[in-house]
């Protein structure tokens, strides 16, 4: 056997080698060596809602961070808010757009929060995700670039870029075709300026003294020479800022969207700038693909109002299940997060993995077991597999129980009877998700799932033999309900009544659904009646 094949087989056998995050962690260690600390980075401009597409980058880094820590490595996980970027477009999901319009071309930290909740527009979007990440077990160190630039932290990095602007120009040209390359006579400045008077970026650099002095003019009429050691309005453009910060923070891993990691994209040019200007080898990277919503094509854009953010997803998916979606999908694979009937399948898949991990279900092979175990481990909020298997009840069953008990979680848990105290918190989170899905998603995507028991004394329009048959179910089947060991016994008892009376069994079942929930169909009737219970059924059917 070749050494390569042997390594591949070992990776399948070892649970800490079979996941893509583990393979990436090994690559980082192999390429960067044994370090005192490994800095892994992520970041975004808070120009709008931080949606699930953005979250994919965050959790991709988190999974690799966990894999490194599982190898005993000290890891620093930084998340940069690029909040000194320009406010370029008014999003559709913020109030008072006419006010925001006035702040176009300002730094986004200078744009007001028109909801009046936070001190500025950028902070509004930062807070939204910062408060949610702990719910899914993600705890990065947040870096605020506006504060850092205004504190003149990057003075030397800007100076080096200005002094080597011709080299940077060559780096940028390297991946451009002839039609788009900058010409030798073209003026290029790696630094951009926010005007010291009007605060907009409507400026043009007119001179540089070779050290710290940059002269500029603004469309507002302001002209000045600024010393970047004290001036607060200078910042590097994206393609230079990114590699400058790699060196500043000593970043060894940072993924990128497929638009950045494409050949000749911003990562390729940043890699050149990082090495040639800042003498720092670019971090190991990996490409992550877009996240779609089922039925909504294309990349989600936070400049549009129709976005799904992390708290929206956590309304429907308990944290472990949401992590499972990302941990179980390779980052370079485009996938859709669904809020329709597929939600039930996602929960079923997670529960199946959980049963395999605890030996309730048997995996097809050791390789499959190791893979499922690692995905399950990475799906847990704290990264640890619970000592005992969590209480399992299907999402589908919860939707039925919750509607029977009008969303009362305490009554649902009481009806289950065998929930241990240590499992209750996790179960309650699943209950909350199931109830939200029934109230907000199911009416559109699965109306047949929605029902309400007739507890108000109302009656279905039954007559003749069908009315008699329903009464017989009440008088003959309900008294024996607690003796039935299986759902099919309840079904058979009703089928026998229909046969004896010469009725179509399906028509009797339809009549029972009408009597119970005012619908022609619903959950499987025998199981449904056993869940509702004899006393509640007797109360509903007593009006006939």
Where are these regions (language model features)?
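N-terminal catalytic cores of NTP/NDP-binding nucleotidyl/phosphoryl-transfer enzymes
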Residues: 2-95, 243-266
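Basic, alpha-helical terminal appendages of large translation-related enzymes
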Residues: 1-35, 50, 76-77, 169, ...
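Charged, often glycine-rich, active-site loop that binds/positions anionic groups
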Residues: 84-101, 157-158, 298-300, 305
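Catalytic adenosine-cofactor/nucleotide-binding cores of aminoacyl-tRNA synthetases and other
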Residues: 262, 267, 289-443, 517-544
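Glycine-rich phosphate/pyrophosphate-binding loops
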Residues: 69-87, 278-295, 506, 522-544
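Active-site cores that bind ATP or allylic diphosphates and position pyrophosphate for catalysis
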Residues: 138-310
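A glycine-rich helix N-cap at a beta->alpha junction
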Residues: 99-123, 128-132, 136
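Glycine- and acidic
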Residues: 10, 41-50, 143, 248-259, ...
